[in-house]
């Protein structure tokens, strides 16, 4: 506009996909380029948007924690806060479905919740399904495999040592299958030494190496993927029991605080694939004793038979940020 001088708008609020606040009092000019580029003019505003969520290390500088009043209409009603509180109280129904439209801020809110739980002394593992799985060919067994790996990761990180029977159960559960599969797709060995126990140095690290090979097969090898899925399908109750034993050992190590798992990217599944995974295997995916949060396609909540999942999962919806205009 001729004769119009653009005011300095750098200290103002700019919305990105996950509602990010720029707080001038906490803004460090020297670190300005480390996170994102702020708009200096109206023309720059589109370039200041970022489609990805805030990372945990960015929360302190950019996270804005007062969006619930414009999401739910009430600052004291928060689906994320409900899940946060529920995760801290052991319950028979400890699995959650988090629904929300793409870009509404689910991942950022989950990252913030995970950071707060960590401050409270809990161990959280974020499972990135978009990286670890082929989202075009999902099966419930894949989630149970990643669940087991997540628990072993937490156990290794916390110095937890599950009892020898549990270690032996996990080792034998997959050893028999990997012997049939042979060499993993990445060319690594799948064997573990006989006689390993919870006191053997590096035992959990060796289990994690085995899981790394299995994950590679789940994503890239159709033939081996079928073998692993069949093992879970035939012996899912045995695998869940082993996972719960590991979770119990972690809980004891953390003075009663249960491990918490968050499955990201499942809301990006084809709705029919997601329905096949969760509806047909609801009892299995919800049948664990520790808190698990699954992101979930919001479109499926409009199905008339969605209510059938309520008996297995606690579901919460993160609404979009609502805006009101003067006109």
List the predicted regions and their residue ranges:
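The catalytic "switch" region of P-loop NTPases
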Residues: 9-11, 34, 44, 223-231, ...
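Charged, low-complexity, helix/coiled-coil-prone segments
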Residues: 48-56, 83-101, 174-189, 217-233, ...
